[in-house]
Amino acid sequence: MVLQAGVLSFPDAKEYFLAIVRSIRERFPEMGITLSLGEQDQPFLRELKEAGAHRYLLRIETSVPRLYRRLHPANHSLARRKKCLRDLRGLGYQVGCGNMIGLPGQTLDDMVDDLLFFRDGDFDMFGLGPYVIHRDTPLATPRTVAWWEERREEIFQRTLNVIALLRILMPTCNIAAATALDVFHKDGREQALRAGANVLMPSVTPSAYRHAYLLYQRKPCLDGDAERCGRCIVRKAERANLRPALGVQGTSLHFLHRTHG
């Protein structure tokens, strides 16, 4: 199970997150718990691990300082993001990272730098996402909207290429096929599986709340319950000539090799 939220660091939010993790661990002791709660301090990350969390996804978005400064508020720090990733590794998490592909101003050299950062960081799992424009973000100027529409197929293909290159660089890591790929093509995630991804994530968020979590426009899978999403995911894997591994935690082989030799 993946639990994702914004960066909430006040005491009540921390207690809320801890209570959820403890409840899941108590009721479903065999379930793997992945968290994506943004940058958090090391003591809280330790508490979450002790409560029962196994994995933590913290995307770098871009390892290039120039782009990172452009995409984030002034009080955000690339150095702090990297420190948090190191903290997660030191606490024994399966550590996930990732980037956004196709950003305005991003070059091929920038994407190569990201891949080298992933390799050198020795991460266990990855969430790579294509840039999908959202009208309520600072990047969504009329000029950028037109730019994105003209280059959407290029962004999609570059995402598949990065997945394939990452699979070659890190053959035993877990790589998610991002839901956002289905914005570009109905079989976008299936194409990602063929390119080298090996993880699909069905949404179990109640449909009544999915419209409140629109990270990008044209987001698929806003209707339907968890059971329907699960069946859809199985069909996608089968159409990519893969057999889904159901009922297992799906621990990254890279993590097992890294921690057990």
What residue spans do the PLM features occupy?
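Core AdoMet radical
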Residues: 1-15, 19-84, 94-101, 124-127
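Conserved, mostly hydrophobic/aromatic
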Residues: 3, 58, 88, 118, ...
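Short, small-residue-enriched loops and turns at beta-alpha junctions
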Residues: 7-12, 74, 102-107, 133-135, ...
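Generic structural signal for well-ordered alpha-helices
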Residues: 17-22, 45, 82-85, 115, ...
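Surface-exposed amphipathic alpha-helices with a cationic face
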Residues: 18-28, 49, 85-90, 163-170, ...
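Catalytic cores of alpha/beta
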Residues: 41-50, 103-119, 183-195
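Aromatic-anchored, glycine/proline-accented short structural segments
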Residues: 84-135
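Auxiliary Fe-S-binding modules of radical SAM enzymes
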Residues: 119-261
